[in-house]
Amino acid sequence: MRWSLCFAILVGMSQSVTIVGAGLAGSEAALQLADRGVRVRLVEMRPKTPTPVHVTGCCAELVCSNSLKSEKPDSAAGMLKRELAELGSQLYAQAKLHAVPAGGALAVDRTAFAEAVTALVEAHPLID
């Protein structure tokens, strides 16, 4: 309900949104808004301006394979993941698809995860 209200307010204010940064938050926000009919302009500095830690120009590129932390339901990170799943997070779904063994943590194949998120963003007709 919280997300629905926020999106309803945002859509009422504007028919398009510019998001600066195609990291985890920017990519998720772009996909969620576009799925709700909002045209999104997603701006990312890479690959034109590289960083010392990123190796691709992909969206949502993690710099450490275990960046998504614990999946234990009694941990803060685990609770957040449960909420992300309940709210339909597309990045969390991709993380689960590209998970690699890491004990109680959610670790992903960084390249496969970033490429999958980039493919989702690039394929969405409402994201420029």
Task: For each feature predicted by the language model, list its residue ranges.
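Short helix-loop-beta connector
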Residues: M13-S14
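N-terminal Rossmann-like FAD-binding beta1-loop-alpha1 element of flavoenzymes
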Residues: V17-V40
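General structural feature for long, well-ordered alpha-helical segments within catalytic domains
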Residues: A25, A29, L80, F113-V117
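N-terminal FAD cofactor-binding segment of flavoenzymes
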Residues: Q32-V38, L42-Y92
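Feature captures the FAD/FMN-dependent oxidoreductase FAD-binding
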Residues: A85-D128
